[in-house]
């Protein structure tokens, strides 16, 4: 078997990626989230496949088909809640994965980082179109509000919105195409994830110290396979607790009401994992400005390698930037909270301050703290 895994055309790819891969000996549990994201993707594709067997993408039957899955299909309720809460687990792992990349300076691996940003955007798009499928009140109005933002694009905006809708409003054509997108996008994510891994294995993994670890590598198997398995069991435990005991805690009560174009919910809001971006969107009174801020809130991640002037790798030995980093995380939590609040004082003001702080930390404070720390090293 040893010879086979090293010489077989297919098995040697697996061998170089997951068995004999030279890995830094000191990577911590923060490095577990890559494998957890892979696990989440597998869970989502499998549960999604079984849901798609019973779901109908028609405005008259979509809501009923989801109810039918929960009531009449064997373990349909479990599959549906694993899928819905699996999306939340996916985004928790995703945000921690990105946060770890920022903290430990993984953005210096340019290709891996940029593919990661594409993966983040694709996952957000997949989650958005998936949220529309149950055809509840919040699904319908969320789709209407978010797709309508594209009308802010000069000249082509209105045409683009009607093209995406497949008509003059969110209707049957929209639901059908959103189902098609939601089915194909996870496989595109899987393909991008392989490219992400390919680029990562070209350079090798980063490590907590931020130092070159070429002289201290260990094989991925059995050390990190067992470590990843522990993470996977913990993830599955949390997911099962969510799906079995608190299945609707992260959902919206409005989605228990079938979509009604004549009745608008009091507060239109997306799923919790989009609330930070939604708060940034709402904090700018101008429509086009809000849309640009929304897009930039994710694309600004691409500026980390450009704005990095530090002579040290990662934040482990940089206390000034560490403080700014944790302020940034706290600010993100504030934005998430504000995104779920009604548009009224004082929430609008807090949202505007938090949005300005979000961009200021990345564009101004982190580069300034880098310069300060570089000068301290010279002393």
UniProtKB/Swiss-Prot annotation:
Query: Which cofactors does this protein require?
Result: heme b
* Gene3D superfamilies linked: Cytochrome Bc1 Complex, Chain C (1.20.810.10)
- Assigned keywords, A-Z: Electron transport, Heme, Iron, Membrane, Metal-binding, Mitochondrion, Mitochondrion inner membrane, Respiratory chain, Transmembrane, Transmembrane helix, Transport, Ubiquinone
The entry marks the following residues as binding heme b b562, namely 83, 182
Q: What is its main location?
A: mitochondrion
Give yes or no: UniProt keyword ATP-binding.
no
Q: Which GO terms describe its biological process?
A: mitochondrial electron transport, ubiquinol to cytochrome c
Q: Which residues cross the membrane?
A: 33-53, 77-98, 113-133, 178-198, 226-246, 288-308, 320-340, 347-367
Q: Which residues bind a ubiquinone?
A: 201
Q: Which GO terms describe its cellular component?
A: mitochondrial inner membrane; respiratory chain complex III
The cofactor binding remark recorded in the entry reads: Binds 2 heme b groups non-covalently.
Give the matching Pfam families. Answer: Cytochrom_B_C, Cytochrome_B
Query: Is Ribonucleoprotein among the key words of this record?
Result: no
A GO molecular function assigned to this protein is: ubiquinol-cytochrome-c reductase activity
- Localization terms from the record: Mitochondrion inner membrane
In terms of InterPro entries, this protein maps to: Cyt_b/b6_C, Cyt_b/b6_C_sf, Cyt_b/b6_N, Cytb/b6-like_sf, Cytochrome_b, Cytochrome_b_C_euk/bac, Cytochrome_b_N_euk/bac, Di-haem_cyt_TM
The membrane topology term of the UniProt record is: Multi-pass membrane protein
Q: Which amino acids does the record list as binding heme b b566?
A: 97, 196
- Per its UniProt record, what CDD domains does this chain match? cytochrome_b_C, Cytochrome_b_N
Tell me its family. Answer: Belongs to the cytochrome b family.
**Tell me, how does this one assemble?**
The cytochrome bc1 complex contains 11 subunits: 3 respiratory subunits (MT-CYB, CYC1 and UQCRFS1), 2 core proteins (UQCRC1 and UQCRC2) and 6 low-molecular weight proteins (UQCRH/QCR6, UQCRB/QCR7, UQCRQ/QCR8, UQCR10/QCR9, UQCR11/QCR10 and a cleavage product of UQCRFS1). This cytochrome bc1 complex then forms a dimer.
Another remark in the UniProt entry says:
Heme 1 (or BL or b562) is low-potential and absorbs at about 562 nm, and heme 2 (or BH or b566) is high-potential and absorbs at about 566 nm.
What this chain does, per the record?
Component of the ubiquinol-cytochrome c reductase complex (complex III or cytochrome b-c1 complex) that is part of the mitochondrial respiratory chain. The b-c1 complex mediates electron transfer from ubiquinol to cytochrome c. Contributes to the generation of a proton gradient across the mitochondrial membrane that is then used for ATP synthesis.
Please give the name of this protein: Cytochrome b
Q: Which species expresses this protein natively?
A: Akodon paranaensis (Parana grass mouse)
């Amino acid at each position: 078997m040893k010879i086979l895994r090293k010489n077989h055309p297919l098995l040697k790819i697996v061998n170089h990626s997951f068995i004999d891969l030279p890995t830094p000996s000191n990577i911590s549990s923060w490095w577990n989230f890559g494998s957890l994201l892979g696990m989440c993707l597998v869970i989502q594709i499998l549960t999604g496949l079984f849901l798609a067997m019973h779901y109908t993408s028609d405005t008259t039957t979509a809501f009923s088909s989801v109810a039918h899955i929960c009531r009449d299909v064997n373990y349909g309720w479990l599959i549906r809640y694993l899928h819905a809460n699996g999306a939340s687990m996916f985004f928790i792992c995703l945000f921690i994965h990105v946060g770890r990349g920022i903290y430990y300076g993984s953005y210096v691996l340019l290709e891996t980082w940029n593919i990661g940003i594409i993966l983040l955007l694709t996952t957000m798009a997949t989650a958005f179109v998936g949220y529309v499928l149950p055809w509840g009140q919040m699904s319908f109005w969320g789709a209407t509000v978010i797709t309508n933002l594209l009308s802010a694009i000069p000249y082509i905006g209105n045409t683009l919105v009607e093209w995406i809708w497949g008509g003059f409003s969110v209707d049957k054509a929209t639901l059908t195409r959103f189902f098609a997108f939601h089915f194909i996008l996870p496989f595109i994510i899987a393909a991008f994830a392989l490219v992400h891994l390919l680029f990562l294995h070209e350079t090798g993994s980063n490590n907590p110290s931020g130092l070159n670890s070429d002289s201290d590598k260990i094989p991925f198997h059995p050390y990190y396979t067992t470590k990843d398995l522990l993470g996977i069991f913990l993830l599955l435990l949390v997911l099962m607790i969510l799906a079995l005991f608190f299945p609707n805690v992260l959902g919206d009560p409005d989605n228990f009401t079938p979509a009604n174009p004549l009745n608008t919910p009091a507060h239109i809001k997306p799923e919790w994992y989009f609330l930070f971006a939604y708060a940034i969107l709402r904090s700018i009174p101008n429509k086009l400005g809000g849309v640009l801020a929304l897009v930039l809130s994710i694309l600004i991640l691409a500026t980390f390698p450009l704005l990095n002037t530090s002579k040290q790798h990662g934040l482990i030995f940089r206390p000034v930037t560490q403080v700014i980093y944790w302020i940034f995380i706290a600010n993100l939590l504030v934005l998430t909270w504000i995104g779920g609040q009604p548009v009224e004082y004082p929430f609008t003001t807090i949202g505007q301050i938090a949005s300005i702080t979000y961009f200021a930390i990345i564009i101004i404070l982190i580069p300034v703290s880098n310069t300060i720390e570089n000068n301290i090293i010279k002393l």
